[in-house]
From Swiss-Prot:
Matching Gene3D superfamilies: 3.40.1190.20
InterPro entries xref list: PM/HMP-P_kinase-1 (IPR013749), PyrdxlKinase (IPR004625), Pyridoxal_kinase_PdxY (IPR023685), Ribokinase-like (IPR029056)
Pfam families in UniProt: Phos_pyr_kin (PF08543)
Protein role: Pyridoxal kinase involved in the salvage pathway of pyridoxal 5'-phosphate (PLP). Catalyzes the phosphorylation of pyridoxal to PLP.
SUBUNIT field: Homodimer.
Organism: Pseudomonas putida (strain W619)
Gene name in the database record: pdxY
Alphabetical UniProt keywords: ATP-binding, Kinase, Magnesium, Nucleotide-binding, Transferase
Enzyme category, top tier: transferase
The protein's name: Pyridoxal kinase PdxY
One GO MF term attached to the UniProt entry: pyridoxal kinase activity
Length: 290
């Protein structure tokens, strides 16, 4: 019997709706990965509602919880760590300490960093110290880096001017440590405005993918968290980088189709769960010559 992968997901959690672990955990479980959720915050709802209640986990609790898993002899079974939104650089350093602890007992474990800073419409949404931590520390430790366009631009200190420029910038990030860069949402000048574009860059090749851009009165939150989680899960299940890339684009599109059909602000993960497991659509990644 094939072993089921185990993944430690360190990010935010909301009681109502879907963001952070609340957007990623169930879909990863649905496709066959055991997820260990470590919630860095517990809020009533995501912050785009404008008001929320809840509290942030003390940074010292992160390595303490990782050590607790070690104490029962299970830490070596962890195949990957996923991190998302950070409330502080101290929290980020605590996560990297946990990653280091896991890699000490399982050197094959992967670390996916979703370097949440913001997006093109809203700009940067994290403190400067978090941006600096992601640039100076997290990139070097990540095996997989999943920025959006704003985050790619922030890492490289300039705005991308074309698709080829995005590839060059991603390759520059690979020189700092990661094995692969997945740009979850491209927003370079001159792109096709009615398509949602993504980019996958490894040390050897690059791939570009387009899917239809769906319109919403209010853009659902948690799409990036869902994307990062599904990509990592499929890699753990044995997909190649490109297979995981194509699957993720299709599965996320299925969730958005269901969300749009329900006229919902929150991602319709439960209603779309069978389509997450078995997407009906397929988007083929095009290998780039540059």
């Amino acid at each position: 019997m094939k072993r089921t992968p185990h993944l430690l997901a360190i990010q935010s959690h909301v009681v109502f709706g879907h963001a952070g672990n609340s957007a990623a955990v169930f879909p990863m479980q649905r496709i066959g990965v055991n997820v260990w959720p470590l919630n860095t915050v517990q809020f009533s709802n995501h912050t785009q509602y404008g008001q929320w209640a809840g509290e942030v986990l003390a940074p010292a609790q992160i390595p303490a919880l990782v050590e607790g898993i070690s104490n029962i002899g299970e830490l070596g079974h962890c195949d990957a760590v996923l991190s998302g939104y950070l409330g502080s650089a101290e929290q980020g350093r605590a996560i990297l300490a946990g990653v280091e602890r896991i890699k000490a007992v399982n050197p094959k474990a992967l670390y996916l960093c979703d370097p949440v800073m913001g997006h093109a419409e809203k700009g940067c949404i994290v403190p400067q110290e978090v941006s600096e931590f992601l640039l100076d520390d997290a990139v070097a430790q990540a095996d997989i880096l999943c920025p959006n366009q704003l985050e790619l631009d922030s890492f490289c200190g300039r705005r991308a001017q074309s698709l080829e420029d995005c590839v060059r910038m991603a390759r520059g990030l690979l020189e700092r440590g990661p094995q692969v860069v997945l740009v979850k949402h491209l927003a370079y000048p001159g792109r096709c405005e009615d398509m949602f574009e993504m980019l996958l860059v490894t040390r050897d090749h690059s791939w570009h993918l387009r899917r239809p851009l769906l319109a919403f009165p209010r853009q659902p939150v948690g799409v990036g968290d869902l994307t990062s989680g599904l990509f990592l899960a499929r890699v753990l299940l044995g997909d190649s980088w490109v297979q995981a890339f194509e699957y993720t684009a299709a599965a996320v599109h299925e969730v958005l189709l269901e969300t749009q059909a329900c006229a919902s602000y929150e991602l319709q993960l439960v209603r779309a769960q069978d389509r997450i497991a078995y997407p009906r659509v397929r988007f083929e990644a095009q290998r780039l010559a540059f």
